[in-house]
Amino acid sequence: MRLVAPLLLILTVAPAAADPATAVYNHACAWCHGRDGRGDGPAAFSINKYLSPRPRDLTHGRFKLRSTPSGELPTDEDLLRTLERGIPGYMPSFRGLTAGERQLAVTAVKRFYPAFASAHPMPVSLPQPPTLDAATVARGHQTYEAAGCASCHGERGHGDGPSAPQLKDETGLRIRPADLRYPARFKNGAQAIDVYRTLVTGLDGTPMPSYADVFEDPGTLWDLVAYVGSLAR
């Protein structure tokens, strides 16, 4: 009987076990994104301390890699795609987790931004790619110049445009434009449909805007996709 009180005390003060979503997040994500999702995990400050991208602050609700319009929250599928693919050069793929564990990680990520609870994000329309040929590349080159893409990405897509040295992300960190010769490094995917999605949605929090309202004709965007693809080494 004398053991009952100490046992009750132990049960009272012992910390509750993390729920499954938090447990997966703490195991797989907190090292970079931090236990509280602020992008300040133990490894965060060894990752490009003075350059963007840094680990995402998940409490701000601003996500780069989405299929939703600029300024909108991502869908669950967007978050899962990022977990499955990773971000070349910055974030590993988490295909080593089970599908269920990745879904739990998404649940944990969404908890850091309360607006997810009532949000119903809808993806933009992504039409099927047309045939991309020399004619579309030529038109895309004209669009590339007319839209001012070279100011950041450079005349030949090397990421060395005149604006490149001054570019910063929303936190004030310097950010480099993509070198379009190396699609394997594209953060939002290297396939034609991925590039189209990036042009339509933009990369929120960076100088890369959405062109959805600039080019209302999907054909013009596909021309630009074709030209970007032609720059690959």
Labelled PLM ranges:
Residues 104-122:
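Short, structured interface segments
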Residues 10-25, 116-145, 184:
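Electrostatic cytochrome c docking/interface patches
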Residues 35, 105, 109, 128-134, ...:
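Catalytic cores of nucleotide-enabled group-transfer and carboxylate-activating enzymes in metabolic
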Residues 1-7:
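Sec-dependent signal peptide recognition
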Residues 47-95, 102-110, 166-229:
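Extracytoplasmic electron-transfer domains, predominantly the class I c-type cytochrome c fold
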Residues 23-52, 115-119, 141-172, 201-210, ...:
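Periplasmic/extracellular electron-transfer cofactor-ligation site
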Residues 110-114, 131-141, 210-211, 226-231:
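Short, charged low-complexity intrinsically disordered segments located at boundaries
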